[in-house]
């Protein structure tokens, strides 16, 4: 459950943003590792596509665009790759979740916020 993941981050790190809801890239990586998964920060679009083609889910910190309005960032999970598109799971919206999106659009809307990218990038392969 998302609440259990949030609790893991909140109880074990200082990376939980309780004022604006959410966590940093460091918090996400902590949770991935705490649940027994390995992680790889993806720094190029080619790496992102390769991870998705190999069947690995990807944690994605995104900026303004499809998933979040101006002056904010948001986290989604990407999975699968077909015909230049990937499926997004959005914990904040039943409208945007479960749909396929152009990989170029996702890449171009990646977060550049240091809170999200202090781990080296905005995308993290899980597993």
Tell where the protein language model's regions lie, with residue ranges.
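Cysteine-nucleophile protease catalytic domains, especially the papain-like/related folds used
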Residues: 1-40, 119-127
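Short linear motifs in intrinsically disordered
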Residues: 17-21, 48-50, 79, 113
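Detector for Asparagine
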Residues: 11-12, 17, 33, 71, ...
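Active-site-adjacent substructure of cysteine-protease-like catalytic cores
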Residues: 41-93
């Amino acid at each position: 459950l998302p609440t259990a993941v949030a609790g893991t981050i909140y109880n074990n790190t200082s990376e939980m943003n309780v004022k604006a809801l959410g966590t940093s890239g460091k918090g996400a990586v902590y949770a991935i590792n705490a649940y027994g998964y390995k992680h790889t920060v993806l720094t190029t679009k080619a790496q992102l596509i390769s991870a998705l083609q190999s069947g690995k889910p990807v944690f994605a910190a995104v900026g303004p665009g499809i998933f979040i309005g101006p002056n904010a960032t948001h986290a989604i999970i990407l999975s699968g790759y077909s015909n230049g598109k990937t499926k997004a799971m959005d914990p904040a919206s039943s409208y945007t979740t479960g749909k396929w999106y152009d990989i170029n659009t996702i890449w171009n809307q990646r977060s550049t916020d240091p809170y999200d990218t202090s781990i080296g990038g905005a995308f993290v392969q899980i597993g």
